[in-house]
Amino acid sequence: MSKQKGNRVNGERRLIALLLLTIFGGLPTTPVLAQEAVSSRLRVVVNSDQDSVQADGGLTLREAIALVNGTLSVDRLSEAEKPQVSTATGATSEIAFQLPTAQTVIRVSTLLPDLAVPVVIDGTTQTGYAADTPAIAELPLAAPIVELTATQGTFVARGLTVVSDNVTIRGLSIYGFTDDHDDTARTPPADIFIAHRLPPPDISKQKIPANSSPFYSDDIPPKNVLIENNWLGIRPDQSVPPTTSAFGVSVFNSTGTTIRRNWIANHDGSAVITSVRSDNLVVTENAIVGNGMAGMPDGIRLEGNIDKAQVTGNLICGNDGAGVYLFKPQGAAQIRDNQIIYNGRRYRRAAVYLMGNDHQVTGNTIAHQAGPGVVVASFPRSSRNTIESNRFSSLEGLSIDLVTQDNVSVHDYQRGDDINPRRNSPNRRKDTGNAAINAPEFTARDFILSGTQAQLTGKADSGSQVQIYRVTEGTFAHGPLSEQIGSTSADSQGQFTLTASGLQPGERVSAIATDPKYGTSEPALNALVRTADAATPAPIPTPNAVPRCTNPPVAQTPPVPVVPQTTPIVLKVPKNVHFALDKDFISLTSAKVLDRIAQVLSENPNIVVELQGHTDPRASDAYNLDLGKRRAISTRKYLIRQGIDPARLTIRSFGERQRIADGDTRLDFARDRRVELIYKDARNIEVIVQEEDLQIEPAGGVR
């Protein structure tokens, strides 16, 4: 008998047995009571931080979920627990919290039951929750009190799993949920995971993987899920938890999910990641900070069906890759009015990377990116992407970069390919992002001011809308597009004219063109604005901002003014830490060195650091580049745990390519195995080359 036929026979036997038990009264009555409980909609108050299902003196979160799901009946509770259950007055069941003051951390050792019915899990009901007291100045995010985490030393893949429509998760701190990454045959780990019932789908339903989503009609994605006012990956005291979660919110298969006013930080992977379906997704007013530390590096990663998705009003800062990365999506998304700053800390990647068509990137502030601003891929075909009214500054690349000629190297999928030549063939329409719409060209390299006005003229693709931008930095020949100062249209011959106001001598301008049929262009070559006498004062440099993602709330009383220093400040700080042979973890001695560095960084918030990983020359170049990167990552994670803002720390690996010395002794190799800290600040920093944490391998040691 084949395995498939045997399974079918066994299933039929089980079904017959269940029918016989039903006929002769052999089934327990608990499921009947449970279904009655579901139909009546319950309000359950969690008053115990334990993780058990038993009749005792306290009602646990695990019991509360089972009660609202209908898998646990009220009559199985103790007399002390029953008063915690009542009929809900709202449209759905509700799980509230009244935990003892010193017992607000719920530690679970196994997966909690799926949220299989409409329910509100409301951590704001816990005594002491202060909704009107924001923890940071940037967004109205109140600190939660109730914490949900995995028991220390255990792998629990998910904090809460949503498989039902109309589920709300509110006011919780959820962290420490990850999995054994050596095992690939598991559902994705996350603080909150949203999918249809029984994820993942039973892939035995089909023998050969299909090109479409491997789901049947009964795999219905949950609708109208709301995730709000939670802190994911971060504790209520704003510290990094001992175990970091894999992902924040994984929208595996859902429609109409809203993620708003959450602080999502410190994850190994992305803060928000989608997979099969996430149409009508709304991600708004969240602080997405310091994610991607050991896995998927992007703050928000959108894949699958993302039609009508919106990413609006978020602070996206200090993440290891892109702020927002769209990977081969179906449907169009809006990325609007976000602060996308200080990203690309581990991978030098675009702040926003677009694949696909008809996306809109508008009104964003994109700054301090270790890569370009917005990149549009050439493959898969990507066009009609509108990129307008954004403000760019402090980039390592173009404000807008359209990848051309089907360039598909790793570099192209991270940083683009820099400025394109003008379109010289109809084939460029086929192999370039946004169908190779040409960047505008000014008719002159400089324009004469009349007072504070200048008439700017140029040429662009006919019929396109041209936006003119002020350029406040002198880093690139094309942009950055700092501030929009006007817009006009190109006529049928491609000519455009704009009288721009409010300009000063020595300022520069650039431009972009947008055609609804093709999308937005790369920036024009900058032009200078000057007076007729050619006296052009140098532009005033923009002062450097303190590199921080979040700040404490604004004080009610004005701070005492700080008297500026009249003499340069000299700081003494170590510039390197060392590692053992073939290791990437921080030794106890190296930790003491990093503690000294962290103290200096805490006392001097203007300093930013590049962490450069190095190895000795043994092993292959590729292996050593990876080892150097892992050492830099370990150093960065240690400093973040000491409270250093991730926006201040970038990493780079040189592997064996920059040795300390050319010798081949054990001492030489020990000096090579290091992370160098490159400090950047306007003040005078005296760096100390220290060797107190050198780790020399034993004689005869091998890798």
Predicted regions and their residues:
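N-terminal, post-signal-peptide segments of secreted/periplasmic proteins
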Residues: G26-K223, T244, A367-Q369, S378, ...
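Extracellular beta-strand solenoid repeats
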Residues: A96, D122, E147-T149, T161, ...
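All-beta strand scaffolds that present successive hydrophobic residues in beta-strands
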Residues: I121, T168-R170, L226-E228, T257-R260, ...
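Periplasmic OmpA-like peptidoglycan-binding domain that tethers envelope proteins to the cell wall
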Residues: T615-V687
